[in-house]
């Protein structure tokens, strides 16, 4: 009997919604990346996009452990000499709450064409509302929340 190899057309995708309220950023990112890649499915193959869609709500209420709000920085470069700018994660969470969560999750995905394709299935929203009610997303519970 030949070994089963999953194909892109054989995949059934589910929609999950994750509430990020008081969840540590790294723990949320690991769970979301596993759902996006499809590592929770028995048909997982690293070369096939077999993952599910993930909606993250309340990204503005994410928790960070330790003093990361003030001591960890997000760097950007304009491309010009001396164009490096930095902003603390606390400042970035206030101004762009979805960007911090997206960057943490995308950093755990493959850095190739497949990773960019998987990244499109991630939807992050700062508040509690999202426009994907028609997809009937299943709530995904993350048990470890910040104390």
UniProtKB/Swiss-Prot annotation:
Gene3D superfamilies per the UniProt record, alphabetical: Ribosomal protein L13 (3.90.1180.10)
A Gene Ontology biological process noted in the UniProt record is: negative regulation of translation
Q: Which domain of life is it from?
A: Bacteria
Q: Name one Pfam family in it.
A: Ribosomal_L13
Q: Does the keyword Protease apply?
A: no
**Keyword annotations of the record:** Ribonucleoprotein, Ribosomal protein
Entry GO terms, CC: cytosolic large ribosomal subunit
User: Could you give the subunit structure recorded for this chain?
Assistant: Part of the 50S ribosomal subunit.
Q: What does this protein do?
A: This protein is one of the early assembly proteins of the 50S ribosomal subunit, although it is not seen to bind rRNA by itself. It is important during the early stages of 50S assembly.
Q: Which family is this protein grouped under?
A: Belongs to the universal ribosomal protein uL13 family.
Q: What is this protein called?
A: Large ribosomal subunit protein uL13
The protein's organism comes out as Mycobacteroides abscessus (strain ATCC 19977 / DSM 44196 / CCUG 20993 / CIP 104536 / JCM 13569 / NCTC 13031 / TMC 1543 / L948)
* Gene it is expressed from: rplM
